[in-house]
Design a protein with these regions (language model features):
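Short amphipathic alpha helix immediately N-terminal
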Residues: 88-103
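DNA major-groove recognition helix of helix-turn-helix
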Residues: 125, 132
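Alpha-helical elements of the RecA-like P-loop NTPase motor core of helicases
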Residues: 108, 130
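Helix-turn-helix DNA-binding helix
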Residues: 121-122
Length: 137
């Protein structure tokens, strides 16, 4: 597996977190719609087909199910990453990879936390990628 393929595999966790965030924002939008409907209950006829409370509840339930599935998937990915990082058998490389791919820190932040220069962090990252064994199940 090339280093690019390894990076793609490693970034899956961040992608999963972004996906969860997107679903949570959508859920908030539906909650806002539900609040507006419950605030404006009226006998007056309206034009067009309005969303019913039942429709909104169904949609929100579907979104919550998606969020639960995505959270479960992200936890599985995180565990895969942690196992792969432990396989590096080097605490410094393991820490660097966790900061980068689990904590999603940028290079400047990693350099500060680890007490190294950014170029040295890049060098360690390259070494970690070379040593990293990815178990694609």
């Amino acid at each position: 597996m090339t280093n690019k393929e390894k990076k793609d595999w490693l970034w899956r966790y961040k992608e999963a977190l972004l996906d969860i965030d997107s679903w949570q924002r959508e859920l908030e939008e539906w909650q806002t719609r539900a609040e507006k409907i419950t605030q404006v209950v009226s006998d007056m006829p309206r034009g067009g087909k309005a969303l019913e409370v039942d429709d909104i509840v169904i949609k929100m339930t579907e979104i919550m199910d998606n969020i639960k599935a995505k959270v479960s998937e992200s936890q599985k990915i995180k565990l895969e990453l942690e196992i792969a990082f432990e396989g590096l058998n080097d605490g410094i490389l393991e820490g660097l990879m966790k900061y980068r791919y689990i904590n999603c820190l940028d290079w400047a932040q990693i350099a500060i936390v680890m007490g190294y220069s950014e170029p040295h962090c890049w060098k360690l990252h390259g070494k970690a990628l070379e040593k990293l064994e990815v178990d694609r199940q």
